[in-house]
Amino acid sequence: MPIRVLDELPAVNFLREENVFVMTTSRAPGQEIRPLKVLILNLMPKKIETENQFLRLLSNSPLQVDIQLLRIDARESRNTPAEHLNNFYCNFDDICDQNFDGLIVTGAPLGLVEFNDVAYWPQIRQVLEWAKDHVTSTLFVCWAVQAALNILYGIPKQTRTDKLSGVYEHHILHPHALLTRGFDDSFLAPHSRYADFPAALIRDYTDLEILAETEEGDAYLFASKDKRIAFVTGHPEYDAHTLAGEYFRDVEAGLNPEVPYNYFPKNDPQNIPRATWRSHGNLLFTNWLNYYVYQITPYDLRHMNPTLD
């Protein structure tokens, strides 16, 4: 799907250089179809980098996707220019009366922070409750998975003693599930988290269906049977260099991090890493857009299927 964004968004030129199909709002009206409306709640500090990563994955199908970027943290950003936020992001009050086909909630570097200590925790709760009645399908990524499990299912925060960082092998549990359609039996995906997602915990305390696990038995991909919510505990959107950037940042901060697993060639941080998960990430987001959003969303968004309760 060509993603539809404002002409001036920096991602337009960045992604076009990669031959990603981006349609600006000035061109889009020439196609007489209703674009899918997808809201991205971007919780990552480096918002422009994160925009590029997610927009790349949303761009590779035949329908238009109308992207709206959302922020809920009113504090001044140290990593993203205020002008960018003011020009390209909306506040929740701007869209709370609208309906959307899809919502993506990104990760956030909050793995060691208690939920109630997160500055925008009340706003997270507000958005997730709102989404029940205003969004066809929501996709949670990494830390957002942990937050959603707490808000929607009452599951306490589960934290690892050491950070999981690297590129790990996974296997699918339901090869005929729509969200894993076309996946290889085993596939690679990056992780960068303190959050812990034991598969047994998901099975015991939710009615969610686990679709893929790590080799160590952690849940990687799971979803509700009605397709209204889906969860991915890793970072399939990451660029080839993202884990390297996090590793060297932590080295400079004196945190003595472990070298990300199965990432640098020959396990040597001086070697340039390669993305071995790109096809998986593209297929995951294409499947979500097609089977969890496009196939079940109403043509007229004024007539939503209400509530997950």
Swiss-Prot record:
Superkingdom in the source lineage: Bacteria
Localization in the cell: Cytoplasm
Keyword presence, Plastid: no
Keyword Amino-acid biosynthesis: yes
Any one biological process term the GO annotation gives: L-methionine biosynthetic process from homoserine via O-succinyl-L-homoserine and cystathionine
GO molecular function, one term: homoserine O-acetyltransferase activity
The protein's annotated pathway: Amino-acid biosynthesis; L-methionine biosynthesis via de novo pathway; O-succinyl-L-homoserine from L-homoserine: step 1/1
UniProt-recorded name of the protein: Homoserine O-succinyltransferase
Entry keyword set: Acyltransferase, Amino-acid biosynthesis, Cytoplasm, Methionine biosynthesis, Transferase
Intrachain disulfide bonds: none
SUPFAM superfamilies assigned: Class I glutamine amidotransferase-like
Species of origin: Salmonella gallinarum (strain 287/91 / NCTC 13346)
Purpose of the protein: Transfers a succinyl group from succinyl-CoA to L-homoserine, forming succinyl-L-homoserine.
Subunit structure: Homodimer.
GO cellular component: cytoplasm
Gene3D superfamilies (UniProt xref): 3.40.50.880
Site (Important for substrate specificity): 192
Active site: 142 (acyl-thioester intermediate), 235 (proton acceptor), 237
EC number: 2.3.1.46
Similarity comment: family membership: Belongs to the MetA family.
